């Protein structure tokens, strides 16, 4: 019950309102507010009132303008970048090493046999077109060639370039097509790409035949390797005990067993040291060469795949623990026959994230499915870009590219199942829209670690020590008394911290909420002499104004409803006799005849009779003497 009474009281208070008029509220506010200016408006003479009103209005506008500037600056989410230096014992970076050739030619020769013969015939046509004979191409398998052939574009007449088939019609007839040859100065090699039905064809031009041949060979090799099982591809690569000859971390010996294998399609079998997936990351005791990682690698250059790997050396990359190594984009080469020393400096990048920076903390707010999540690695923008491209490949070409992970239920592209995949892939790769779409959807990681490298090289081994070093390494790996290694196939690496000083580049908000409140309060106090309480007072008067306005509107609506006019009486006014009869007609019978002479019959008289209600008998109208009423009251009391 007390709660009900309290609620009813509150309801009545709301319905009643503040109890003031607009003018009374304004006068009360000007008399009681702590803001400078309003009190002078009502206390001074007419001229000063006008002057103080204009000054108060002007300064109020200045305060609102300054507030708008500060709020806009705060909502721009600007950041300030600070650089700090630190010194501490740091974890040694993860080191990924690969061979430039993804496979051993001796193990993939049976897969590339037809492609190798076709490639030799292509080079013969490019280098010596007039000396080539028909019988040299009669044994070639043109199944691969017909999907994506190389052509010659004769540009001796720039206004009318002529496209020539590199082999003419020699694989279909005994006579070559006329005019199907031209010299190297007048022709350029291009790749012809056609859709499945052959109605749409484009040409990918190159400035050099070397680029055209290499690109075409990699495209055809991708078609072949995409149809091989992953475990078979791993077996065709370089084994860890064949590529890693010696390992030393600080003063502790290590071997290929301390490396985690991973298959990278561009470089085959790669091996990661100190990845930190199953073991704790190794710290570096001190800066300097003696406390880093020393490796001797055998790249086996004599077993490289022709045309697929034109660079001899080791490919390596330094990265943070539990991150996927994107060696093709971020790796470096170490040349064979040299000792490469890599000094490392550490930079830590720490971003604020949304809304200050367009970065992500863990990739959970990125709309792209991370195809590298199966490796249990952290998010990176390269993983997002590759996943985005693979998603576009599947959507546009109905298959995935061999170089990137494949979503569940999808298949890799190949000429047998997807005849026009090369046309679709290269069109998508050259699409600016695709790149911009992926760049807009992917975000940089807010927290990143970058390793700045200083690289120096020297010949290794020297001529004086080459013989005994190669003998020892051959004995350790092959148990052979003869030299089984070559200087052209070995690489020595020294990776170490130059110093333990590290830099932290950190973002911080340039304008935080404390900055905003202090500036808002400073401007309000400077121009108006007010505080937060003054704003509360102003808010109170605004609420009262709204309250009064609502009550007035409600009352006005109710008054309109009450004053709504009723339908007017259409008949003539009744006479005195009719009124008397109405009061004495206790049966409420309608009149059938009129008492007036020359009475006219109105149609509404029968339908709208005057009610005959007798006057009420009120006890209060009974007049009695005062003493009689008092006696009656006494009797009732008794």
UniProtKB/Swiss-Prot annotation:
Domain of life of the organism encoding this protein: Eukaryota
The family database entries (Pfam families) matched by this protein are listed as:
ASC (PF00858)
Output the GO biological process annotations, alphabetical, semicolon-separated. Answer: aldosterone metabolic process; artery smooth muscle contraction; cellular response to acidic pH; cellular response to aldosterone; cellular response to vasopressin; epithelial fluid transport; erythrocyte homeostasis; gene expression
* Subcellular compartments: Apical cell membrane; Cytoplasmic vesicle membrane
Residues on Extracellular side:
72-530
Please name the InterPro entries in this protein's record. ENaC, ENaC_chordates, ENaC_CS
**Phosphoserine modification, residue list:** 631, 633
Q: Per the record, what ranges lie on the membrane's Cytoplasmic side?
A: 1-50, 552-638
Keyword Glycosyltransferase annotated: no
Protein topology in the membrane: Multi-pass membrane protein
Q: Where is this region: Disordered?
A: 598-620
- GO terms of molecular function: ligand-gated sodium channel activity; WW domain binding
Q: Which reaction does it catalyse?
A: Na(+)(in) = Na(+)(out)
Give the residue interval(s) assigned to the motif PY motif: 614-618
Q: How is its activity regulated?
A: Originally identified and characterized by its inhibition by the diuretic drug amiloride.
State the tissue distribution: Expressed in lung and epididymis. In the caput region of the epididymis, expressed at the luminal and basolateral surfaces of the ducts and in the smooth muscle coat. In the caudal region of the epididymis, expressed along the luminal border but not continuously, in the smooth muscle coat, in the interstitial muscle tissue and in sperm in the caudal lumen.
Entry PTM: Ubiquitinated. Can be ubiquitinated at multiple sites and undergo monoubiquitination and polyubiquitination. Ubiquitination by NEDD4 or NEDD4L inhibits the ENaC channel through endocytosis, intracellular retention and degradation of its individual subunits. However, some studies could not confirm the ubiquitination of this subunit of the ENaC. N-glycosylated. N-glycosylation is required for interaction with BPIFA1.
Q: Which cysteines are joined by disulfide bonds?
A: 98-270, 182-187, 194-201, 247-254, 359-446, 384-442, 388-438, 397-424, 399-413
Q: Which Gene3D superfamilies does the protein's record reference?
A: Acid-sensing ion channel domain (1.10.287.820), Acid-sensing ion channels like domains (2.60.470.10)
Which of UniProt's keywords are assigned here?
A: Cell membrane, Cytoplasmic vesicle, Disulfide bond, Glycoprotein, Ion channel, Ion transport, Membrane, Phosphoprotein, Sodium, Sodium channel, Sodium transport, Transmembrane, Transmembrane helix, Transport, Ubl conjugation
Entry similarity comment: Belongs to the amiloride-sensitive sodium channel (TC 1.A.6) family. SCNN1B subfamily.
Oligomeric state and interaction partners are given as: Component of the heterotrimeric epithelial sodium channel (ENaC) composed of an alpha/SCNN1A, a beta/SCNN1B and a gamma/SCNN1G subunit. Interacts with WWP1 (via WW domains). Interacts with WWP2 (via WW domains). Interacts with the full-length immature form of PCSK9 (pro-PCSK9). Interacts (N-glycosylated) with BPIFA1; the interaction is direct and inhibits the proteolytic processing of SCNN1A and SCNN1G and the activation of ENaC.
Tell me, what does this protein do in biology?
This is one of the three pore-forming subunits of the heterotrimeric epithelial sodium channel (ENaC), a critical regulator of sodium balance and fluid homeostasis. ENaC operates in epithelial tissues, where it mediates the electrodiffusion of sodium ions from extracellular fluid through the apical membrane of cells, with water following osmotically. It plays a key role in maintaining sodium homeostasis through electrogenic sodium reabsorption in the kidneys. This subunit is not essential for ENaC function in airway surface liquid homeostasis and proper mucus clearance.
Q: What is this protein called?
A: Epithelial sodium channel subunit beta
